[in-house]
Amino acid sequence: MFLNPVVPNGYYNLRGGAMQSKATPIREDGIYHSFCGLVSVGWLYQKIKDSFFLILGTHTCAHLLQNTLGVMIFARPRFAVSLLEESDLSSSQPDISAQIEEIKREHHPSVIFLLSSCTPEVMKVEFEGLAASVSTPEVPVLFVPASGLDYTFSQSEDSVLQALIPFCPPAPPDDKRVVFLGSVNDAIADDFSLEAARLGIPVAGFLPASHFTELPPIGPGTVIAPLQPYLHKTATQLRNERGCTVLSSLFPFGPDGTRRFWEDLAAQFGMQVDLSEREAAAWERIKHHTDLLRGKKIFFASDTLMELPLARFLKACGAEVVECSTPYINRRFHAAELAALDGVRLVEQANFHRQLRTITETKPDLIISNIITTNPLVGQGTVAKWGTEYCFLPIHGWAGVNNLVTSFTRALQRHARLDPLGSDPIWLTGMMPGSSGGVISLQS
């Protein structure tokens, strides 16, 4: 069943008129995602500094978080896994009250997020009731659906922000300020605050804020400016429940996206700004890197929901985007990005076997792939890099331009330096099971 909303007759463009998009995504039958959404805890617990994230899960969940995030238990991070044991299988509802009290005693959080995982979802644990049973007005416990059965790697942040909406104070209709939507590190947040002040745009804050007690007021006069391309549920809920305006623009990745983002945001406040010189200067600073990317064939096969703006940026750099696949595309929320990707092959839920054939035929210079397929693709001699790292990199706005472009060029330059060593069997021995100096075909 196709669930994404289709907006007839084009999309609303803040610059005026209807914005027609000729980019028509193809829907295939591949997997929805390949990396667990619980890993979003890795950047969210650092962003919301007075929070604690408790995952109800299994030993597999605990191993995933410890190995993926590289945090040892003695570091006392502000997240943990409440392990389900065999005895819990026969109980109607797990008891986490002891863990909640221990978390309050040792970490003193202002809010606790209770995240679901695959096993308790299958067990039909009633998470909302479980969270309500241990929640208090002083320290609310908020249920966050994050099971890998239903959510992509980055979508769990969308669930966390939805849980925070009731705690954002209401703003009066005449309070017209912007709220930046999406988790970015403090340096990037400061850059956006300074740029807004430079342009004369009033800022109410960020969602999520650095502290639970500092959530921004949101009301009918608020302009929501999404920073991340995977937050359409939060944006839709804010528009429906608070009556605020959701900015429809390019996401602030790269000089082109950042310029368009700020110009469209300023237009919401009745200001016309021209940032063409700022954009040109940003392109000039990364000219060495764009020269390397120009003409290169790039293939997106990742699953972070950041693929559309990344592909649009590479297209602006002069690269040839052979294909951009992503778990899903929301035609309304991603309208501006779709319009900018006219002529690029866009695929939802791509069939990986078909992608392998396309990769063999087109021979891309760089593949942005998911965590399952990157190493096997490298083993076949292609240049591939994880798409997951883009969720952790500071690549937003003017301050993030250099980090964004070098994330692509470093992969190409590294391969060029290692290529002379690639024929040595020592690099391939043991890479795939049963392989002695060679690589098992992914199609076998």
Curated annotation (Swiss-Prot):
Cofactor: [4Fe-4S] cluster
Family: Belongs to the BchN/ChlN family.
Keywords associated with the record: 4Fe-4S, ATP-binding, Bacteriochlorophyll biosynthesis, Chlorophyll biosynthesis, Iron, Iron-sulfur, Metal-binding, Nucleotide-binding, Oxidoreductase, Photosynthesis
The gene coding this protein: bchN
Taxonomic source organism: Chloroflexus aurantiacus (strain ATCC 29366 / DSM 635 / J-10-fl)
Role: Component of the dark-operative protochlorophyllide reductase (DPOR) that uses Mg-ATP and reduced ferredoxin to reduce ring D of protochlorophyllide (Pchlide) to form chlorophyllide a (Chlide). This reaction is light-independent. The NB-protein (BchN-BchB) is the catalytic component of the complex.
Protein name per the record: Light-independent protochlorophyllide reductase subunit N
UniProt-listed HAMAP family: ChlN_BchN (MF_00352)
Binding site residues for [4Fe-4S] cluster: 36, 61, 118
Pathway named in the protein's UniProt entry: Porphyrin-containing compound metabolism; bacteriochlorophyll biosynthesis (light-independent)
NCBIfam families (UniProt xref): DPOR_bchN, PRK02842.1
Taxonomic path: Bacteria, Bacillati, Chloroflexota, Chloroflexia, Chloroflexales
GO biological process: light-independent bacteriochlorophyll biosynthetic process; photosynthesis, dark reaction
Assembly mode: Protochlorophyllide reductase is composed of three subunits; BchL, BchN and BchB. Forms a heterotetramer of two BchB and two BchN subunits.
EC number: 1.3.7.7
